[in-house]
Structures are given as C-alpha cells and as structure tokens.
Amino acid sequence: MDLIAQLEAEQIAALGKEIPDFKAGDTIRVGYKVTEGTRTRVQAYEGVCISRKNGSGIAGSFTVRKISFGEGVERVFPLYSTNIESIEVVRRGRVRRAKLYYLRSRRGKSARIAEDANYKAKA
C-alpha cells in the first residue's frame, strides 16, 4: 500500500463511520445535520443516487436526486462529511450505467428505475 492510500485509510478509520454499500440507481435516505440558529436537527433527504465520485476514499462524494413539489432537486454529499448522521439504502435499483445524468431530462414513468430483487452484497 502506498503512502497516500495508507494516510487515507488512517483518516477513514479515525472518523469511525460505517458507510453502507450503495451505487448509482439505489434509492437512499441521508440523515443530514441542519443548524438553524442555535438548534441542530437531522433532516432526511431521500432520493435516487445518480452518481458516485472518487469511489469510497476520503474525498468521495455522491449525488442524490429527488422530485420535490414537481421540481427536480439534486444535492451532492461528501461521503465522510461530519454533517451526515446516517446513510440508509431504501431499495436497490438495477441500472446499466455508473452515472444516471439522463434522469435529469426525464419525468414520470420514464424516470423509473427497476428494482434489483436479487442483489448480492460484495463480500
């Protein structure tokens, strides 16, 4: 293992976060800490993961898209952000692409993603 990968592994271990195995096409629920004045609360943001960048390293991020009041909303979350309380996989999607940017131009039934019924987690 080279020096940079070793430093990354140490930083990830120091954070002590458990990141579930998810990919583009999966519907996920992100518990994100929101600070309003002096109060801090956890806000759930649920949508389809349309991309993952930089894998599962310390600099990794993922984009979640949802339709809110008829308008498409996307948020990019850093994978190891201290503001992320939890990441939960709601359902597994079956897609053939790593980046689902084509969903931006689709609405309704054409934007649906088939559920992956026989998903096998990596060992």
UniProtKB/Swiss-Prot annotation:
It holds the Pfam family Ribosomal_L19. PROSITE patterns: RIBOSOMAL_L19. Coiled coil: none annotated. It comes from Ruegeria sp. (strain TM1040) (Silicibacter sp.). This is Large ribosomal subunit protein bL19. PANTHER family: LARGE RIBOSOMAL SUBUNIT PROTEIN BL19M, RIBOSOMAL PROTEIN L19. One of its GO terms (biological process) is translation. This protein is located at the 30S-50S ribosomal subunit interface and may play a role in the structure and function of the aminoacyl-tRNA binding site. GO terms for molecular function: structural constituent of ribosome. The gene is rplS. Keywords: Ribonucleoprotein, Ribosomal protein. GO terms for cellular component: cytosolic large ribosomal subunit. Belongs to the bacterial ribosomal protein bL19 family. HAMAP family: Ribosomal_bL19.
